[in-house]
Regions:
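Conserved beta-strand hairpin/beta-sheet module of binuclear metal-dependent hydrolase folds
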Residues: 1-48, 139-153
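Metallo-beta-lactamase
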Residues: 38-55, 59-71, 83-131, 135-207
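Short metal-coordination and nucleic-acid-contact micro-motifs, chiefly zinc-binding Cys/His arrays
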Residues: 232-235, 261
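Short cysteine-rich clusters marking metal-coordination/redox-active sites
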Residues: 239-242, 265-268
């Protein structure tokens, strides 16, 4: 289940977001047993969730984008006063076109523990290069009360992959993803780390419980119950990589199934096999 949650960091002087989730109105995924990823159903729109925490868009001062994909960057335009920090290698991505106030991160502050390249964003908040999932993938670490909170974007989709030391989601650079995974695991073994994934319920549970990741003692997996009986077929398909929605009504009525086999996602260039029913 491809849950995508994002994080707010309130320093007392600033309100900092890590990613901004899917855009408002994004369609629910249609569960299919053969689909590579189930995008899931919306629980709450991102901006509504932020308002429920007591924050207005104008209060947000910085947004730290782990990577370009639409399920992490969907609401960037909703924050008029925020500087948007993103790895300079992601600049120019279709998902970031026409986004104002982007600050390219050049990792000018040297090493952060065993990670060779980092940039300090605020007191106790660090932007760290973590290439692999995308060429510009990054992770964020926030230090608080002796703990290291790691907001890792899509280095893993689920904690089970981290425990098993397996690469699960790599789109751009397999070798770099392996190096990043090795560094993440090394860091966790030596520093008390709360591992906050965006695509698993364990991310929220780890954060709420301040649960320090122990690689030798995995937390038991609780499988979600999914109803595969399905709703009516809308004819729409969504890219499981970048969130691009294919709607036949916007393409002269051409059904997704009738597109040529060599057709690619207009945004991220992934093949048809990466699309799920919406």
């Amino acid at each position: 289940m491809a849950v995508c949650r994002t994080i707010s960091i309130d320093t007392g002087n600033e309100v900092i977001l890590v990613d901004t989730g899917l855009p408002a109105g994004f369609p629910d995924g249609a569960p299919e047993e053969t689909a590579p990823i189930y995008i899931g159903k919306s629980i709450c729109e991102y901006m509504d969730a932020l308002a429920a925490l007591g924050y207005k868009p104008e209060q947000v001062t910085k947004i730290l984008l782990t990577h370009k994909h639409g399920d992490h960057s969907g609401e960037l335009k909703s924050f008029p006063n925020a500087k948007i920090y993103v790895n300079a290698e992601e600049i120019g991505a279709d998902e970031l076109k026409d986004i104002p106030n982007i600050v390219p991160v050049e990792f000018t502050d040297g090493a952060y523990y065993n990670f060779p390249e980092s940039q300090k964003i605020a007191d106790g908040v660090y932007f760290i290069k973590a290439k692999g999932h995308t060429n510009g993938n990054s992770l964020i670490i926030a230090e608080n009360e002796g703990l290291f909170y790691m907001f890792q974007g899509d280095i893993t989709y689920v904690d089970e992959a981290l425990y098993a030391n397996k690469l699960s989601v790599v789109f751009d650079d397999l070798a770099a993803a392996r190096e990043t995974m090795d560094r993440v695991r090394e860091f966790i073994r030596h520093q008390p780390t709360v591992y906050c994934g965006t695509h698993t319920p364990q991310g929220y549970e780890n954060l709420e419980a301040k649960r320090v990741m122990d690689l030798d003692n995995p937390v038991p997996t609780v499988l979600a119950e999914i109803d595969f009986s399905q709703k009516e077929d809308s004819g729409k398909y969504v890219c499981s990589v970048c969130g691009y929605l294919y709607d036949p009504a916007e393409h002269d009525g051409v059904a997704f199934e009738d597109l040529p086999d060599e057709w690619r996602c207009p945004r991220c260039k992934q093949p048809k096999t990466k699309f799920n029913k919406a």
